[in-house]
A protein has these predicted regions:
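A short, well-structured juxtamembrane/interface segment
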Residues: 24-50, 62-63, 68
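Residues at the C-termini of beta-strands that transition into short coil/loop
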Residues: 36, 83, 105, 161, ...
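Non-catalytic C-terminal accessory region of glycerolipid acyltransferases
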Residues: 2-21, 25-30, 42, 92, ...
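General small-molecule cofactor/ligand-binding pocket signal
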Residues: 33, 102, 188
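Catalytic core of membrane glycerolipid acyltransferases/transacylases, capturing the structured
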Residues: 49-108
Length: 252
C-alpha cells in the first residue's frame, strides 16, 4: 500500500469515526427479529469449525451486524479488505470492532488473496466473510472464486441474508441497502454447503449455480416476512426527493 499523506490519514480517521457512529445508530435503532435458521450454525459454532459466511454485497450493513453477533458467540470472524489506501477506512473500522482484517483484492491480486484466505482458514480457523458478487458485480451473481476457496479448505459455505421493513437503496451497481432507523430487520441463515475437493468444470458450475440459488432463496425468505414484498421490487422504489438521483426509498 502506498504511503498515506497526513491529509489522507486525517480523512480516514474522521471517516472511520463518522461511519462507526452511523452504523452503530442503525444497529441500535433497527428492530432485529429472531434469526431464522440459526440452528444451522449450532454444530459449527459448538465445534468452533471454520466456515465461509456468504451474503450479497448490497447487504453489508446488517451482514456485518450479524457477524459481530457470531463473533461474540466464539466465531473467529474475518473480512477481506483491499490493500489500497481506499480500503484503509474499512480496515480501521473492522479493527475497532476486534475483527480480523485480511488484506487482499479479489480483482487485482486474486491469487494472493486466495492464498491469504486459505492460510487464515486452515491455520487460524478464521471465518472469512465473502460477498460472492463483489467487489464490482454483476449483482447477485455468485463468482466461482468462492467455490474454489470452499474446495481448497473444506470449509462449508453458509448463505446469509437480511431484509429491512423500510430502506433506502443507492443507485449503485449492487443497489446497496441502507435500512431506515426503527425498521424491522429479518435475518436468515441458510443450510451449510460442503463442496467436494475434486470437481469437473461442469460440476463446479453446477455447485456455483446451486450456491447462487441458495443465497437468493435465503434472501427471499427474509423478504417474505414482510407481506411477500421483495426489497428488490422496482415498483416499491421511489426517489427520496425530486432532486436526488443517487438513492431510492423502499417502504413496505
Amino acid at each position: 500500500m502506498a504511503q498515506l499523506t497526513i491529509k489522507k490519514k486525517l480523512k480516514i480517521v474522521l471517516g472511520t469515526f463518522v461511519l462507526k457512529i452511523v452504523v452503530r445508530l442503525l444497529w441500535a435503532t433497527c428492530r432485529v427479529q429472531p434469526v431464522i435458521g440459526e440452528e444451522h450454525l449450532q454444530h459449527i459454532l459448538t465445534n468452533k469449525t471454520a466456515f465461509i459466511p456468504c451474503f450479497w454485497h448490497e447487504l453489508l450493513i446488517f451482514g456485518a451486524y450479524y457477524m459481530r453477533r457470531l463473533q461474540k458467540r466464539g466465531a473467529n470472524v474475518g473480512f477481506l479488505v483491499s490493500p489500497s489506501s481506499d480500503g484503509e477506512l474499512g480496515s480501521q473500522l473492522l479493527n475497532s470492532w476486534g475483527i480480523q482484517v485480511i488484506r487482499g483484492s479479489a480483482t487485482r491480486t486474486g491469487a494472493q488473496a486466495m492464498q491469504a484466505l486459505y492460510t487464515v482458514i486452515k491455520k487460524d480457523g478464521v471465518c472469512p466473510v465473502n460477498n460472492p458478487d463483489g467487489p464490482r458485480g454483476p449483482a447477485r451473481e455468485f463468482k466461482v472464486g468462492t467455490i474454489l476457496l470452499a474446495q481448497l479448505t473444506g470449509a462449508p459455505l453458509v448463505p446469509l441474508a437480511y431484509a429491512a421493513e423500510k430502506a433506502w437503496r443507492f443507485r449503485s451497481w449492487d443497489k446497496f441497502v441502507i435500512p431506515k432507523p426503527f425498521s424491522r430487520i429479518n435475518i436468515v441463515v441458510g443450510r451449510p454447503m460442503y463442496v467436494d475437493k475434486k470437481l469437473s468444470k461442469d460440476e463446479q458450475e453446477a455447485v456455483r449455480y446451486a450456491a447462487q440459488t441458495a443465497l437468493n432463496e435465503t434472501l427471499r425468505t427474509a423478504e417474505s416476512r414482510f407481506n411477500n414484498l421483495q426489497l428488490s421490487n422496482a415498483q416499491n422504489e421511489r426517489p427520496l426527493d425530486g432532486k436526488n438521483n443517487n438513492c431510492d426509498d423502499t417502504t413496505r
